[in-house]
Amino acid sequence: MLCLYFTLLPLGASAAGLAHDMSVSVLAESGEIVAEDTIHVDRKRAVFEFILNAGYAVRAVDGTLHVIATSDDGLRTAYRVTLQTATDALKLHYQGKPRFSEHIPPGGMPQGIVSSDGVYLDASSAWYPLFDRDFDSLNMVVKLPDGWQSVSIGRRLDDGDRVSWSTERPHDELYLIAGRFFRHARQHRDIELSVWLLEDDPLLADRYLALMGDYTDHYSRLIGDYPYAKFAVVENRWQTGFGMPSFTLLGSQVLRLPFIPYTSLPHEILHNWWGNGVWVDYASGNWSEGLTAYMADHWMQERQGKAEQYRLKALQRYSNFAAAGHDLPLLAFTSRHNDASQSIGYSKSLMVFHMLRNELGDKAFIEGLRRLWQQHRFTRIGFDQALHAIIGDDEQLMVRYRTWLQRTGAPRLRIDSIEVRPQPLGYHLAITITQDQDGPFDFVLPIAVTLEGRPVAKVFQARIDRAKQTLEFDLPQRPLRIDIDPAYDVPRLLDASEQPPALNRLFGGAAWLVLPGAAPAAVHDAWMRLAAQWQARYPGLRTIEDHDAAMLNPTADRLILGWDNALLTGASALFERDDQTLKSRGADIGSETFSADTSSIVLVNSSREGLTTGFIGADRPDAIAMLARKLPHYGSYGRLVFDNASGAAQVKDTLTPRYPALSRQLVDTPTPLRLPSRDELSAD
């Protein structure tokens, strides 16, 4: 991160003992920071080495300061301080305009900022002295322009004329955020809950404050006590979703979305245990994103009875992105930087944790979560260590699960044969399962068998560890239906027949965007801009004009753009469903009729052979621009309708697959699948 080619002088082997006692003044108009920092260490020494932002003028009290090196980008400098007498406290003065990277990542938020608009500082800019270890305690007094407030890690102490931040917890990074905030706070048990807004909105603040305590209570019961003195939601003018120790930084638009208190909020609160409580050793795999997604995002869906669909979408993302040539082992995942990496570090990872929960049972899984917290809080661990803590002493199980971390890919399952024969006390069932990928995985596969006279299927848990395996069952009644992994409990590559028609099937592969050659110039240009934006995000996408589309391979996936598209007439029958009809300038969906004059319509179809065809109906440049922005966030849907004027979603449907190959009816009369109910993950 620091791009400096040397190693800092170690401060000692002790696991504790580095503390900052700081005073920081923000000179917003000039963009300067003025600071004094006394760094306390656990043993006396005569030489200290540290890294600090190169924009500062630095002075060491009672010591001689030498520059060791400056980073290639000129942003950070490494210093050595030599003292005449060994001491356990180094006092530094530094002042100046911090230098920040000129690279602006997607979303537009700079690396750091000190201006009249506000302050954002984190360790990436070395705005405070960085040593060779994390710090164990902090006391920081912050002096700001009139009317400003600050947010940082730890507990807020307001003495009237000054505000300070203090913590006795170990931390790996120090943040300073400041600006003209409106603060709303309430006490929940021993935790201060607060919302910091750039524009005052008491109702919005109350919406968050009303839920925070419930979430901290839930995770405290499940894992262990909440580790910090506060939790704060802080508004950011850039559209971020960052989780820091004891607070989250949410973009102003993000913050006001009605679903965020029920999705992002529990996710960011849980990160105070996973990621900001137990830290991630990124060189050994980022386990925290998958575990947090599982225990927050998946849990919220579980509470609503929608966990099965959530897991299906997770497998869709993994099958469509990572499996399309963009895969990597979980041990190699560090952070999300595109849809493919998200499908691995979030989707596949959470499915591995879900599979482990099913194999251990909820009681043992929760005990493992508590063990992970108790053994590793405020230490840095990789994926293997995290998994080992949850699994415990079962070394054979750990060996099996370690393979899931080390390998790319996932099982691709196929039913080879099913044999049913009567026997004196019922029926004998034999199912032959094949793993089609290179090299078998070792896992437990749920197999649901619906029996005559029983409304709810019986679910067997079968150990699978070979490329081809026959599973045999003695049943008391006649089997009517077989479903392999019907609730999507195993991290696997979905068969094409299982995949619901969805935009992600087009985004994740090598689909063709078919442009409407006869569209008016302004409309055609809008489609070209959409194509360029999507190709930057999804490198597999290619473009072709509709009058050239006859040269496409008949098996090529395609997305037909525009009501004027020459391919629409021949393809409209593909989009026929029992509740759906595509017309020349609109569509009937359920009991409603949508017109191209007022709505933009998105439909996706998948054939029995796995060919995916999509259609986007829009003919206004502003509506096309709206779809270019929105649709990448709706990848799991196969049917969408947006109001052209407001951009609001009028329809967003997840469609069911038509030809699931891992489900077999064994009798002439179709039998519905009903699975046993499940409990949500809870310590209660």
Where in this protein do the model-derived segments appear?
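Glycine/proline-rich low-complexity spacer/linker segments in large multi-domain proteins
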Residues: 71-73, 94-138, 490-510
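Solvent-exposed alpha-helical segments and adjacent loops
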Residues: 500-684
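A surface-exposed beta-strand-loop module
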Residues: 53-110, 464-478, 489
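Hydrophobic helix-coil surface modules that form long, contiguous segments used
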Residues: 35, 130-266, 294-297
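Zinc-dependent metallopeptidase catalytic helix centered on the HExxH motif
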Residues: 134, 249-311, 369, 383
